[in-house]
Amino acid sequence: MTIEKIYPIFTVRWLAVHGLAVPTVFFLGSISAMQFIQR
C-alpha cells in the first residue's frame, strides 16, 4: 500500500521534471544554434 502511494507522486515528479527539462534543453539548443549560425 505504501508503494501505491509513492508511485503516483514519483510519476508526477517524473513528468514535471521532463516537462520542464525538455523545453529548456530545446530552448538552450536553439539559442546556441542561432548564435553559432550568426558567427
UniProtKB/Swiss-Prot annotation:
Entry superkingdom: Eukaryota
Cofactor: binding comment: With its partner (PsbE) binds heme. PSII binds additional chlorophylls, carotenoids and specific lipids.
MF annotations from Gene Ontology: electron transfer activity; heme binding; iron ion binding
Compartment(s) of residence: Plastid, Chloroplast thylakoid membrane
Keywords of the record: Chloroplast, Electron transport, Heme, Iron, Membrane, Metal-binding, Photosynthesis, Photosystem II, Plastid, Thylakoid, Transmembrane, Transmembrane helix, Transport
UniProt similarity note: Belongs to the PsbE/PsbF family.
Subunit structure and binding partners: Heterodimer of an alpha subunit and a beta subunit. PSII is composed of 1 copy each of membrane proteins PsbA, PsbB, PsbC, PsbD, PsbE, PsbF, PsbH, PsbI, PsbJ, PsbK, PsbL, PsbM, PsbT, PsbX, PsbY, PsbZ, Psb30/Ycf12, at least 3 peripheral proteins of the oxygen-evolving complex and a large number of cofactors. It forms dimeric complexes.
Function description: This b-type cytochrome is tightly associated with the reaction center of photosystem II (PSII). PSII is a light-driven water:plastoquinone oxidoreductase that uses light energy to abstract electrons from H(2)O, generating O(2) and a proton gradient subsequently used for ATP formation. It consists of a core antenna complex that captures photons, and an electron transfer chain that converts photonic excitation into a charge separation.
Name the UniProt record assigns to this protein: Cytochrome b559 subunit beta
